[in-house]
């Protein structure tokens, strides 16, 4: 029987897959870590640091994808998709908080569609975080502009009516994004009313002092 040959051939293929996995998994972890730090830098307006970290993340993703190029069963295991999602989130967050206009596309970023859309959904949460920071500094108008961008992204996400197996469970991420947008809308509404009240009191005080 040729069992020895079969087992040897299988071991060779398994060893190759293990080697690819052991290269891709740390690369994905590096990318995710760099993206988390990049988002933190974005909220602090540390742009050089953010760009350096996002570039590091992209290099790590490319390294991981290169490692699994010949092993599609490992490529779709999930961790490289998670890394792409985090990278898309960081790049989209930068575009939203800076008011850059057009968002980067999946092609611009070199990421797959489903990770890109899930990254967009998570960027909505980062938009909320940035708006709350702006409100603490009284920058209501800028907060309104970011909320508008969040709304626009949500409408894209909710229009993606495809099975979860294709979208990486985008529906759940979209539901979370909707909740965050409504909370943020409420926070902004309160801030706007407070600003209007404060302005009215200031005008009244000036009128009284002017009499």
Each predicted region: which residue ranges?
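A structural signal for well-ordered alpha-helices, especially hydrophobic packing surfaces
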Residues: 35, 39-42, 61-65, 87-94, ...
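Long amphipathic alpha-helical coiled-coil segments
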Residues: 82, 110, 142-148, 198-205
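Long, charged all-alpha helical bundle/coiled-coil segments in cytosolic proteins
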Residues: 53-110
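Leu/Val/Ala/Ile-rich N-terminal alpha-helices, chiefly Sec-type signal peptides and the beginnings
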Residues: 1-68
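Long, contiguous binding/interaction regions
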Residues: 82, 122, 149-153, 157, ...
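Non-transmembrane, amphipathic alpha-helical segments
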Residues: 16-27, 39-42, 46-49, 72-82, ...
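Short secondary-structure subsegments characteristic of cysteine-rich extracellular domains
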Residues: 46-58, 138-157
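C-terminal accessory extensions/subdomains outside the catalytic/core fold
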Residues: 169-211
């Amino acid at each position: 029987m040729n069992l020895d040959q079969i087992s040897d051939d299988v071991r060779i293929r398994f060893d190759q897959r293990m080697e690819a996995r052991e290269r891709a998994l740390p690369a994905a972890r590096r990318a995710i870590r760099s993206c988390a730090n990049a988002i933190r830098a974005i909220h602090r307006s540390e742009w050089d640091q953010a760009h350096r970290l996002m570039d590091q993340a992209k290099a790590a993703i490319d390294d991981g994808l290169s490692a699994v190029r010949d092993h599609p069963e490992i490529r779709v295991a999930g961790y490289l998709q998670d890394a792409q999602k985090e990278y898309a989130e960081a790049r989209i967050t930068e575009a939203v908080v800076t008011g850059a206009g057009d968002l980067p596309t999946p092609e611009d970023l070199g990421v797959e569609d489903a990770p890109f859309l899930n990254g967009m959904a998570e960027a909505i949460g980062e938009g909320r975080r940035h708006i709350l920071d702006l409100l603490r500094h009284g920058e209501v108008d800028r907060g309104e502009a970011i909320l508008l961008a969040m709304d626009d992204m949500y409408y894209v996400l909710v229009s993606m009516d495809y099975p979860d197996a294709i979208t990486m469970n985008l529906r759940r991420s979209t539901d979370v994004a909707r909740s965050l947008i409504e909370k943020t809308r409420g926070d902004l509404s309160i801030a706007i009313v407070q600003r209007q009240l404060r302005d009215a009191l200031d005008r009244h005080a000036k009128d009284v002092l002017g009499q």
